[in-house]
Amino acid sequence: MAKGTPSFGKRNKTKTHVRCRRCGRRAYHVRKGYCAACGFGRSRRIRRYSWQNKKVNRKRRR
């Protein structure tokens, strides 16, 4: 099995991020089990910093 560039082509088979239940963004990491945008699954508090300009979008699409 080769390592390096040929192996990177096999990384696109599974979805890394799916839609988050709390913030609605496609930032919930399936294998890690938490959202990169709002921190759902890692903490009860919404991930928020003073240097960021994000709004929490709780509307669900169906």
From Swiss-Prot:
SUPFAM superfamilies: Zn-binding ribosomal proteins (SSF57829). GO terms for cellular component: cytosolic large ribosomal subunit. GO terms for biological process: translation. A zinc finger (C4-type) spans 20-38. One of its GO terms (molecular function) is rRNA binding. Its cofactor is Zn(2+). This is Large ribosomal subunit protein eL37. It comes from Methanopyrus kandleri (strain AV19 / DSM 6324 / JCM 9639 / NBRC 100938).
